[in-house]
Amino acid sequence: MAISTDKTFAANTNSPWLIGNARLIDLSGQLLGAHIAHAGLIMFWAGSITISEVTRFVPGIPMYEQQMTLLPHLATLGWGVGAGGEVINTYPYFVIGILHLVASAVLGAGGLFHVFRSPAILYNSGGQVAKFHYEWNDPKKLGLILGHHLIILGFGAFLLVLKAMFFGGIYDTHIENVRLITNPTFDPMTIFSYLVGIKDSHWTLLGIASVDNLEDVIGGHIWIGSILILGGIWHILVPPFAWVRQILPIVNGEEILSYSLLGLALMAFISAVFVGYNDTVFPKEFYGENRIVIATIQWVLGILALVGYFWHSWRSRELNSNLS
């Protein structure tokens, strides 16, 4: 099937690098390979930048003054820091960086395998692999794939919970030290009130970014991790209802991409508020008092993703009108 690049920057060109993954839109196996290879690139970036920051880290100088990008996140998770947020051991950072580099190699190899050795279309593999072949207008199969993604995200949320509660704890800026979170908040009224901006019976424009204690942070991750895993199981077993498909049509890849970009934009905007105003999640010891530059970057990325949503949503309507 020919891939149309009409109304894109790749229109009227035969340059494969400019057309990008649009060439693979109907090749489920090769698109999976590109997906895995992309994850490998992200892992490689994380690992290489972490190692680079370890090599140039200067003890006694705050991380934010050294323009660190990833080490503050690791320090926030309680790795290598002691009282007052002082870095007492950079070896955990080095190990984490190496693990990411190893993971990037594995993912890169997996991506190359699916591109060059595996069938271009998963259905042709047969067996269990064929179960993951999809058509863009098959909501049941897309629900199967979505479900597995949600379960993985849920496990990711619980990794933070395990680190905070059982494996060394995380950094608490309010006591300026690392501690175990032994009593996370389970009360649904407390946790879900943040979604509508209710904090201590008062409304705040900050919404969930108004959280000011790690018990609520970890309790929220327990809730969201559970919801993600249960939601993943639901989507694996139950196809989207007809009324859902009317609100969020599932007809082509452009629609799926537009929904993903809209979710990404939402996460970026929420992250920007957290970065700018929340010292509990972004301790000033590691990120500094003034984080306007970091927050602005998050806003710009969110706006870019939102523009992408409108672009691909329009592309989807164009494709649907051509089909009709």
Swiss-Prot record:
GO terms for molecular function: chlorophyll binding. GO terms for cellular component: photosystem I; photosystem II; plasma membrane-derived thylakoid membrane. It is found in: Cellular thylakoid membrane. The keyword Thylakoid applies. It comes from the Bacteria. Keywords: Chlorophyll, Chromophore, Membrane, Photosynthesis, Photosystem I, Photosystem II, Stress response, Thylakoid, Transmembrane, Transmembrane helix. InterPro entries: PS_antenna-like (IPR000932), PS_II_antenna-like_sf (IPR036001). Its cofactor is chlorophyll a; chlorophyll b. Induction: By iron stress. The chain crosses the membrane at residues 31-51, 68-88, 93-113, 222-242, 256-276, 292-312. One of its GO terms (biological process) is photosynthetic electron transport chain. Chlorophyll a. It is a multi-pass membrane protein. The antenna complex functions as a light receptor, it captures and delivers excitation energy to photosystems II and I. The pcb genes are not related to higher plant LHCs. Belongs to the PsbB/PsbC family. IsiA/Pcb subfamily. The antenna complex consists of chlorophylls (a and b) and chlorophyll a/b binding proteins. This is Chlorophyll a/b light-harvesting protein Pcb. It comes from Fischerella muscicola.
